[in-house]
């Protein structure tokens, strides 16, 4: 068979073999040679032997280049520069990567950018992410089954590091410390790796004021790519390029979980209120990255070992009444009125910041209040279990649905404000959160800036959701007038009741309330700062 015919026959097969790896690290690069050379530029179609088609260079897909890292200063929260493998990601592991041309993408440029498909990545595609509760019975079943399949299917391309860079070659110096991991567990592991503490050495307390995916501008961009990666992995697993992750609209204001049924994310167990019903497949799931004390004291990294079951007890935290109810429906449109993406210090105490508001450290109007947990944070805490612990939260599959809705809010904000990136800081954000920082631990490197775009036009997906538009001036005036009239009516009615009650009391010579009755104002008077939320 002549070479051109061989290429024609073999290419479709190879296209299926080389699926995208968008994280740490492609299996082909987890070798002594690659680690020592610092090069991770796998072949796409090596007709003439290994190394003959790095990044698909022979067909113009891409080329091997030096990794570009962000060297701008980060914020003051992190004080241990030089001690963490995630600094200037991914330079501690690799300094050369594939840079793909046009719509090509992936660790060897063998796949397509989000929103494109086909052998030459020339066919546009748009995935629709829908409300989980709007899915048919069959669609719900398929989604639940797909999640479970991802939980038990080894990722075809990715392996995870189980040691820090200084120990990556193993005890004998010749055994790379990487492990296989399932598709869904990789999703869990990525999140853990981004939030883990910085190990400072045996006998020293690990540094905890570091988080590459929360409490800063990258919160929305990091989680956007995190979801995009899982969605792509599941599309490949299912061989269905139209598969889209659904969302959970958690802004119901209720004290019940409307997706916690056995046909969806699992009802409450009849035998233990903190466990999932045995009628749900999710009751069989086991949690990854539980041994946080060992990681922090020994300097080890979470591996593929699973532990105990998922814990979940929605609205069950009686010690914190504020987290016993989900965000109110009006919280979302109120959040969308915050027109500045982020504000100094670009941290969890920023005020008038859309990012800090949707993340849930500010109240829905954008005002920072240390006593408040709203929107995304409140939804996590409401779950009251695995889903409420940052390093473990993706183990509960509700995480996926919670974050697709959060991403939908982010995408609507981008649409309303024309993706105004001017207030996304180039520098002085918490480490990992600068605009041009490569998000940890994704591979090939992808910056926060690349995810700060409207999804339908740039990332190939959209949300089936209707948002309430901003109120017009006439509507606001009308609401204000009606509210004022109602208040006046209430005041007159209350005054009439007081007069009538006083008259009756005088006539009967008997007080309405005894001295032992607790007045509503008693607790309020004891609050030092009444303007703060009372929990």
Swiss-Prot record:
Enzyme class at the top of the EC tree: oxidoreductase
The organism's place on the tree of life at top rank: Eukaryota
One GO location term (cellular component): melanosome membrane
Catalytic activity: 2 5,6-dihydroxyindole-2-carboxylate + O2 = 2 indole-5,6-quinone-2-carboxylate + 2 H2O
Membrane topology per record: Single-pass type I membrane protein
Enzyme nomenclature, EC number: 1.14.18.-
Residues that bind Zn(2+) A: 191, 214, 223
Tagged with keyword Protein transport: no
Binding note for cofactor: Contains bound zinc ions after heterologous expression in insect cells.
Listed transmembrane segments: 479-499
Residues the record marks as carrying a glycan: 95, 103, 180, 303, 349, 384
Localization of this protein: Melanosome membrane
Signal peptide limits: 1-23
Family annotation (Pfam families): Tyrosinase
GO terms (BP aspect): melanin biosynthetic process; melanocyte differentiation; melanosome organization
Cytoplasmic side: 500-535
Lumenal, melanosome side: 24-478
Function, in words: Plays a role in melanin biosynthesis. Catalyzes the oxidation of 5,6-dihydroxyindole-2-carboxylic acid (DHICA) into indole-5,6-quinone-2-carboxylic acid. May regulate or influence the type of melanin synthesized. Also to a lower extent, capable of hydroxylating tyrosine and producing melanin.
Oligomer status and interactors: Tyrosinase, TYRP1 and TYRP2 may form a multienzyme complex.
Record-stated family: Belongs to the tyrosinase family.
Name of protein: 5,6-dihydroxyindole-2-carboxylic acid oxidase
Organism, scientific name: Gallus gallus (Chicken)
Gene (UniProt): TYRP1
């Amino acid at each position: 068979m002549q070479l051109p015919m061989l290429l024609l026959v073999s290419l479709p097969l190879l296209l299926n073999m080389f699926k995208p790896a968008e994280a740490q690290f492609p299996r082909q690069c987890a070798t002594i040679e690659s680690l020592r050379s610092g090069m991770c530029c796998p072949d796409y179609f090596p007709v003439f032997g290994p190394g003959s088609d790095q990044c698909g260079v022979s067909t113009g897909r891409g080329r091997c280049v030096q990794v570009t890292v962000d060297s701008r200063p980060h914020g003051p929260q992190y004080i241990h520069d030089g001690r963490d493998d995630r600094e200037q990601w991914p330079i501690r592991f690799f300094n050369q990567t594939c840079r793909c041309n046009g719509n090509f993408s992936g660790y060897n440029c063998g796949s397509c950018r989000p929103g494109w498909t086909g052998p030459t990545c020339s066919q546009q595609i748009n995935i629709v992410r829908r409300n989980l509760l709007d899915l048919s019975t069959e669609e719900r079943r398929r989604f639940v089954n797909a999640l479970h399949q991802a939980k038990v299917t080894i990722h075809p391309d990715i392996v995870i590091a189980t040691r820090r860079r200084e120990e990556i070659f193993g005890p004998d110096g010749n055994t790379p410390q990487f492990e296989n991991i399932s598709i869904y567990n990789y999703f869990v592991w990525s999140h853990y790796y981004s939030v883990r503490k910085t190990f400072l050495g045996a006998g020293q307390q690990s540094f905890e004021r570091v988080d590459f995916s929360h409490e800063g501008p990258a919160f929305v961009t990091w989680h956007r790519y995190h979801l995009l990666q899982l969605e792509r992995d599941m599309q490949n697993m299912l061989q269905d390029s139209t598969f889209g992750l659904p969302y959970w609209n958690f802004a119901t204001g209720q004290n019940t979980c409307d997706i916690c049924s056995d046909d969806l994310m699992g009802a409450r167990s009849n035998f233990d209120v903190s466990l999932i019903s045995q009628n749900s497949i999710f009751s069989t799931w086991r949690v990854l990255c539980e041994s946080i004390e060992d990681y922090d004291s020994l300097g080890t990294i979470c591996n593929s070992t699973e532990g105990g079951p998922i814990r979940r007890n929605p609205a069950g935290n009686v010690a914190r009444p504020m987290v016993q109810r989900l965000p109110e429906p009006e919280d979302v449109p109120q959040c969308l009125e915050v027109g500045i993406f982020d504000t100094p210090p670009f941290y969890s105490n920023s005020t008038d910041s859309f990012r800090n508001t949707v993340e849930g450290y500010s109240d829905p109007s954008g005002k920072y209040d240390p006593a408040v947990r709203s929107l995304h944070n409140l939804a996590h805490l409401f779950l009251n279990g695995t889903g409420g612990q940052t390093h473990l939260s993706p183990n509960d599959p509700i995480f996926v649905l919670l974050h697709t809705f959060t991403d939908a809010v982010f995408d609507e904000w981008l649409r309303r404000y024309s993706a105004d990136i001017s207030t996304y800081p180039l520098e002085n954000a918490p480490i990992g959160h600068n605009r041009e920082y490569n998000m940890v631990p994704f591979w090939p490197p992808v910056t926060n800036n690349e995810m700060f775009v409207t999804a339908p036009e740039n990332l190939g997906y959209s949300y089936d959701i209707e948002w309430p538009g901003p109120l017009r001036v006439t509507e606001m005036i009308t609401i204000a007038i009606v509210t004022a009239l109602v208040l006046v009516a209430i005041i007159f009615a209350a005054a009439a009741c007081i007069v009538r009650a006083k008259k009756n009391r005088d006539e009967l010579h008997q007080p309405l309330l005894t001295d032992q009755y607790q007045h509503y104002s008693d607790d309020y008077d004891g609050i030092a700062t009444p303007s703060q939320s009372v929990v």
